[in-house]
């Protein structure tokens, strides 16, 4: 086999080449309860004001502000309670001179009233109460339309539907939502050295860990995943299974077979399916031989057989492709700053991604590398919630340096919460 010369490109350029391709999924309609994590296919426009009416944000008494003027500790002013309403009810009383309506949170402000006195600001008797401070017009009132007004775009096309977006959709009566269909993914692990999870270990063999990991990463994004039988190092069978996967899926992910060894057939497979190779070497560690190809609106990802490199390739390249296909507004990985808490002295000829554990506090983020960090390492992935990104050309970093990190998880331990 002729060894192909590969020219590395920067990580950012690699992602840009992916999202520059003309690839989009169709719009579909799903039930609201099935829309979580989908991408909106259209703007959502407010069809009425929120709040729809002036309402009370507290439990208390609705009064006329003019009647409270002059109130003080030495001059308590008395009000007579003429009605009592809860959320969902509307008073038919007109609040008059030194009158009040007992009102619960969320209830509509009665006619004549223009301020709310919280219970704790009063001294109550049977059907009266007194106050010791004046209230201004609209004090303690949520005004009609103060959050959104009719015609406002409340959710944008391309926005990810999170639980908050579901609340907005429910507010405006969307029992069904127009979204972009999520791509389906085929996962194909390659390598004659691979055994299935339930196989007995043999000399020179390892269990397939990449396939289950990629499946989990894809399912975490809400994607439908097809798992294919582990492929041995055979060109003809490799071509056949990739062609089959391309007929059924929008994205095909293979793990292994992307290096330049005698048994790495992926370049030949891409030629056989007439795919355009977008890049086949990235200036990064691990995962420098990550390869991405494109044909007929579909992506083919050749991820490294090394678990950490495979994980890194999915986070950096597969995720942006999925978002791009769904028309997401934001497709690039989000980078934040963190303080490195221990030395990392290894030189970095290329951009290096280190599996790590970040801690987010009110004082900022700190990060510690997650155990053994070679490209073939597996355990470090399980204990990481981010990747540290060290720039190429650097000669190591000392504890206390500020570094860039990409969060892959964002939960915190209970003792880290500041309440």
From Swiss-Prot:
Which UniProt keywords are present, listed alphabetically? Magnesium, Metal-binding, Molybdenum, Molybdenum cofactor biosynthesis, Transferase
The pathway to which it is assigned is: Cofactor biosynthesis; molybdopterin biosynthesis
Family, similarity comment: Belongs to the MoeA family.
Concerning PANTHER family, the annotation shows: GEPHYRIN (PTHR10192:SF5), MOLYBDOPTERIN BIOSYNTHESIS PROTEIN (PTHR10192)
Example GO biological process term? Mo-molybdopterin cofactor biosynthetic process
Q: What is its EC number?
A: 2.10.1.1
Q: What is the role of this chain? A: Catalyzes the insertion of molybdate into adenylated molybdopterin with the concomitant release of AMP.
Name any GO cellular component annotation: cytosol
> Pfam families attached here?
MoCF_biosynth, MoeA_C, MoeA_N
**Cofactor(s), names only, from the UniProt record:** Mg(2+)
Q: What is this protein called?
A: Molybdopterin molybdenumtransferase
Q: Which reaction does it catalyse?
A: adenylyl-molybdopterin + molybdate = Mo-molybdopterin + AMP + H(+)
The enzyme class is transferase
Q: Which GO terms fall under molecular function for this chain's record? A: metal ion binding; molybdopterin molybdotransferase activity
Quote the SMART domains the UniProt record gives.
MoCF_biosynth (SM00852)
Where in the chain are disulfide-linked cysteines found? Answer: none
Q: How is the cofactor bound?
A: Binds 1 Mg(2+) ion per subunit.
